[in-house]
């Protein structure tokens, strides 16, 4: 490090960052990501946001203690090729870390293929967003600042949600609800279903399966 950064590189590290660098890593927790517990957070499970049973439920993860208004909000969308996955089994380190840092996080289920056909997935995600905007203040969240994230299929739905604000085609029955968000962070999603550049090998039957 001294060769690359100079002999005095330690002096350029901010004191608050230096304290974090000296902290010991709990290797046991990192090795068990599905049980990545955090102190100082509260989880509310299986809150209904729509009419499709367990597929239309969400969990809220927030700082423990009394509700404090005005906290930033994250809506997280799980992955799983639009066919598998659920809200309680993905991105737990991220969700719990943000809650410990003062965020209110809503992590959602949505209808899955092959039983659900396009555009059921994005309709559910938008309906969940509508619920969050209407109710998240009850849990301390600021409905005026909502970020969204998700990986794989969740990354695709994150991008689609961000790019189609207030689109009535994806908001049947709640066309008048504002579905704009303030930030979107998709991870490794699939974005080109028509393969305009000819990069996909093999059949496109998977797309037909979803639709």
Stretches found by the model and what they are:
Residues 1-211:
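Alpha/beta-hydrolase superfamily serine-hydrolase fold, recognizing
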């Amino acid at each position: 490090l001294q060769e690359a950064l100079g002999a005095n590189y330690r002096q350029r590290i901010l004191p608050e960052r230096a304290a974090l660098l000296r902290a010991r890593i709990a290797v046991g927790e990192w090795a068990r990501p599905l049980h990545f517990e955090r102190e100082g957070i509260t989880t509310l499970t299986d809150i209904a946001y729509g009419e499709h049973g367990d597929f239309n439920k969400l969990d809220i993860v927030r700082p423990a203690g009394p509700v404090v208004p005005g906290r930033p909000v994250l809506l997280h969308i799980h992955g799983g090729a639009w066919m598998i996955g659920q809200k309680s089994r993905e991105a737990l380190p991220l969700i719990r870390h943000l809650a410990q840092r003062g965020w209110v996080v809503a992590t959602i289920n949505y209808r899955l293929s092959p039983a659900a056909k396009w555009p059921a997935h994005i309709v559910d995600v938008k309906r969940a967003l509508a619920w969050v905007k209407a109710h998240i203040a009850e849990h301390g969240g600021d409905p005026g600042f909502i970020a969204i994230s998700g990986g794989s299929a969740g990354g695709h739905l994150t991008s689609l949600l961000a790019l189609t604000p207030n689109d009535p085609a994806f908001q049947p029955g709640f066309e008048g609800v504002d579905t704009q968000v303030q930030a979107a962070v998709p991870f490794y999603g699939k974005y080109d279903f028509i393969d305009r550049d000819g990069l996909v090998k093999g059949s496109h039957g998977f797309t037909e399966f979803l639709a």
